[in-house]
Amino acid sequence: GKKVLKERDAREHLNCVFIGHVDAGKSTFCGQILYQTGQVDVRTIEKYEKEAKEKNRESWFLAFIMDTNEEERAKGKTVEVGRAHFATSEKRYTIMDAPGHKSYVPNMIAGASQADIACLVVSARKNEFEAGFEKGGQTKEHAMLAKTLGVKFLVVVVNKMDDPTVNWGQARYDEITSKLKPFLKSCGFLVKKEVKFLPISALTGANLVAAVADSTCPWWGPMYKAGTHNTDQGALLPL
């Protein structure tokens, strides 16, 4: 009989951990990635939409893909590190959705210690970025831990750019990135080489698979094409 050798998947495998302050949108972001890469079907999404509505958390339906236990869904908080897999034509990924709440830092450390890449999610919404970045917020703590645990590459996603308080405004994006750069440098990241910045909306999926439309955000195209933000790609997955 013929021997059929299972071909080894030659695509590079990367572990990516999603970190950041509570409510920055990490679970929604992970859910959106899985949806856009075809890991979740429309029926499942519709089921989650219905369930989220019943729990008065309408905008949380994508997060339910990652937050599978009842406690997480009821509170709208991630407690354990959620894991999922997806692949692009070039790479295979395992994504880990780490809890952002202060009392769950040990769980977050467990996730980050296995990661090749960390994705730091910050919220652009008025006051939310500040809550995560100022005293007591988890944005700084998570970024420092990621560096300490040996994460070599960081993608900073500025989420909720579609929020009415932001409306894809460049001023807010610039304000946030200019605060983060010196801080990340102080953590030991070589900002020009090891950190990329990207404005996104996890809820609408803008800038995930394809760059956001110029009509929505006219300044992003020229910015990434000029390479000013260490990125030559307009959207996250091509990175």
Q: What residue spans do the PLM features occupy?
A:
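Alpha-helical scaffold elements adjacent to nucleotide-binding pockets in ATP/GTP-utilizing enzyme cores
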Residues: 29-33, 44-47, 107, 141-145, ...
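Catalytic cores of large soluble enzymes that bind and process phosphate-bearing ligands
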Residues: 10, 14, 36, 40, ...
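P-loop NTPase switch module centered on the Walker A-proximal segment
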Residues: 5-106, 115-128
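Gly/lys/ser-thr-rich phosphate-binding loops in alpha/beta enzymes
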Residues: 1-14, 138-149, 185
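Short, compositionally biased low-complexity segments
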Residues: 16-24, 148-158, 210-214
